[in-house]
Regions:
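Non-catalytic DNA-recognition/assembly elements of restriction-modification systems
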Residues: 1-45, 176-184, 188-216
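Short coil/turn segments at secondary-structure boundaries
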Residues: 25-28, 45-53, 151-153
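DNA target-recognition patches
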Residues: 33, 43-78
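Short, solvent-exposed loop/turn positions at domain surfaces
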Residues: 72, 78-79, 110, 156
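A short beta-sheet element
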Residues: 81-83, 87-141
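A short glycine-rich beta-alpha junction/loop motif
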Residues: 114-122, 154-181
Length: 216
């Protein structure tokens, strides 16, 4: 069984968009670098060094496609030596074994709209009217995508990485933005349902613990 929460979406992705590794696509083939802005440059930021921004180290991104932790740091402490990103950007772990394990997520709720994080992330920024962050996340979390990327890593031992050039030149069938948004809606709805179920299970466990406590 797939331990990943994303496992539910693999078949949905294939059904809607086909095998992303196939060159026989129903949609026009594009370089991934044409479908998103890869590792966008940091703009001039009107923040003081004491202003807070969100900080996301590698451990804050789970292997099932979610942010599990995010802290606030003073901009002056993290403005150098870290990766820059914004809300709705997609993070892709480029180093082994994080890449093979599926680390990646869409970033939301950044303090002052700015995030800084590990240099071992590639950042994929969706282009308005061309790509959805949920399609980009789903594509880059597909096991077949990661397996192909693993074969194209450079470096040695525990320092192997997926290059920005590899992602830039990866050929993929680009679905119409309407189809991507339909996939996004399905993804969000299923995610919301899982959240409700998880909260209900926690509530039931709490009740059960209380009742057992009374018996004891």
């Amino acid at each position: 069984a797939d331990k990943s929460k994303f496992g539910d979406f693999k078949s949905q992705f294939i059904e809607m968009f086909g095998n992303p590794l196939s060159l026989n696509q129903k949609n026009e083939l594009k370089r991934l670098g044409e479908c998103c802005i890869l590792n966008p440059r940091r703009p001039n930021i009107a923040l003081c060094d004491t202003d807070k921004v969100s900080f996301i180290p590698m451990p804050a991104v789970s292997e099932d496609g979610y942010l599990v932790d995010m802290t606030d740091e003073e901009y002056g402490k993290v403005k150098k030596g870290f990766t820059y990103f914004e809300n709705n950007d997609v993070l892709f772990a480029k180093i082994t074994p994080c890449m093979e394990n599926g680390k990646g997520a869409i970033v939301h709720g950044l303090t002052n709209g700015i995030g800084m994080g590990s240099t071992e992330f590639h950042v994929l920024r969706p282009i308005n009217g061309i790509s959805s962050p949920y399609w980009l996340l789903a594509l880059t979390r597909m096991p077949i995508f990661r397996e192909r990327a693993a074969k194209n890593m450079s470096g040695t031992g525990g320092q192997k990485r997926v290059s920005a050039s590899y992602l830039d030149h990866f050929m993929v069938g680009l679905p119409a933005i309407e189809e991507q948004r339909r996939f996004e809606a399905i993804y969000k709805q299923a995610d919301k349902s899982k959240s409700v179920i998880q909260k209900a299970l926690v509530y039931l466990n709490d009740i059960q613990s209380d009742e057992l406590g009374k018996i004891a």
